[in-house]
Amino acid sequence: MECPDPQPILELLEAPCPTIGQPRPEVGLRAGAGRVDIARVDGASAIVACVASSPLQLLAPSPRGRCAWIISASHGGGLLAGDEVSLEVDVGAGAVALLSTQAGTKIYRSRGEVASQGLSARVGAGALLAALPHPVSCFSGARFRQEQRFELARGASLLWLDALVAGRIARGERWAFDEYRSRIEVAIDGRTVLADALRLVPGEGPPIVARLPGVELLATVVALGPAVASAARELLERVAASPAERDAGVLAAASPLRDGLLLRVASRSVEAGLAFLRQRLAFVEAVTGADPFARTP
């Protein structure tokens, strides 16, 4: 039996592997880093670059359409002490992007090291970025820091949600972590228009449980720009028309921003708080064409 000429096989093996426009995750990235670029291509929003390095994972259930949808995840569903995760997002002019998470982010117990997470996003003129992750849950003894900065061109829009759960409530944990710090900055045309921070550290003032009696979830929403201005006005009016009651299950307060609002929510149960947010943010599907609270697009 004659053996076939091995040369064509060798040429095939030596040929570069075809790709789908996504470079190898480990090339040029430190551990936990990622980058996503979204652009307007032939009338649709499309992911034109997407790369990540473990423990960060990036999924693209809807890479092209009215809205490009990116889901971030991590191995094990959370961050260990010492993990540093950072993501850069660029949304080109006229594009629409939805950034969410696969599930809630768990922050595991630490013996001193801090788990950190960063997001840096640029949003072009006429573009919209909706950053709507599931809540963060800090376990007993956890240490977590988060920095997020959004740079918007004139005429760009942003919808941002940040939520924090008291901990593993079913196990009796309530605000038992060792450190939680979160900061957001938003700039429009190079000028900072919003800087907001939340710092919860035991030992700094009264116990956290005493400061947040009965509260299981805290959330902040920022809506800015022409794409969400109308919905923001309606939400502002709706919150203003609902006077806060001392024993209410969900408390909400809203402050007007130019072309938007800042909404704060405190809930006595995680379920009630999430239901409130889903209801108040139902307009997202109309402006993006995607449901951020659905399991799949």
Swiss-Prot record:
Keywords: Chaperone, Cytoplasm, Nickel insertion. InterPro entries: UreD. It holds the Pfam family UreD. It comes from the Bacteria. It is found in: Cytoplasm. One of its GO terms (cellular component) is cytoplasm. One of its GO terms (molecular function) is nickel cation binding. Its main location: cytoplasm. UreD, UreF and UreG form a complex that acts as a GTP-hydrolysis-dependent molecular chaperone, activating the urease apoprotein by helping to assemble the nickel containing metallocenter of UreC. The UreE protein probably delivers the nickel. Required for maturation of urease via the functional incorporation of the urease nickel metallocenter. Belongs to the UreD family. This is Urease accessory protein UreD. It comes from Anaeromyxobacter sp. (strain Fw109-5). The gene is ureD.
